[in-house]
Amino acid sequence: MVHFSDSLSRLLAELQKLPGVGEKTALRLAFHLLKSPDNAAALADSLRDVMSRVRFCSVCFGITEDDPCRFCSDARDDGAICVVEEPQDLLAVERTRAFRGRYHVLQGALSPLNGVTPDRLRVAELMKRLEGGGVREVVIATNFTVEGEATALYLARMIKPLGVRVTRLAHGIPLGSDLEFVDAATVQRALEGRSEL
């Protein structure tokens, strides 16, 4: 086993806390930073800057430097709210330019086995926004995972009694895919969600 200095060991440990970074990748990144002190200093400055300036929007809980964020302060359709799990999901929907309403970031998805219950998410804040009136439709854009589906069903059950239309993103076969290579569950969902031509 190789022993590193305390400072290098600490850097390796911190890098491994990042998603998708294992021991080998952490080591490669650490040595790259050691060989490029200017890049390392710029990275450290950038991290300090983003940690001091970026925060969660008090309305939608996306990330922002200004509160409320531009998605909450721009002229948009106040009658539609797209609910996503994470801030990066908000950006993925926004990149399509297909949705012109408001957003709400849950900060996760229901996962009782991992201790993530509705009170650990931004569900209460969503319900408060809806109870304020004026919202016609909530588009649930949670991930198509067990947790995302459970979250979507839970939210639909909570929202429908308010008289607000609840819709879910369509899912199915990706563009450019050959049907023979798509799994059966995806084909089944695509068949169930088929639309008129």
UniProtKB/Swiss-Prot annotation:
One of its GO terms (molecular function) is zinc ion binding. Coiled coil: none annotated. Keywords: DNA damage, DNA recombination, DNA repair, Metal-binding, Zinc, Zinc-finger. GO terms for biological process: double-strand break repair; recombinational repair. It comes from the Bacteria. May play a role in DNA repair. It seems to be involved in an RecBC-independent recombinational process of DNA repair. It may act with RecF and RecO. Belongs to the RecR family. NCBIfam families: recR. This is Recombination protein RecR.
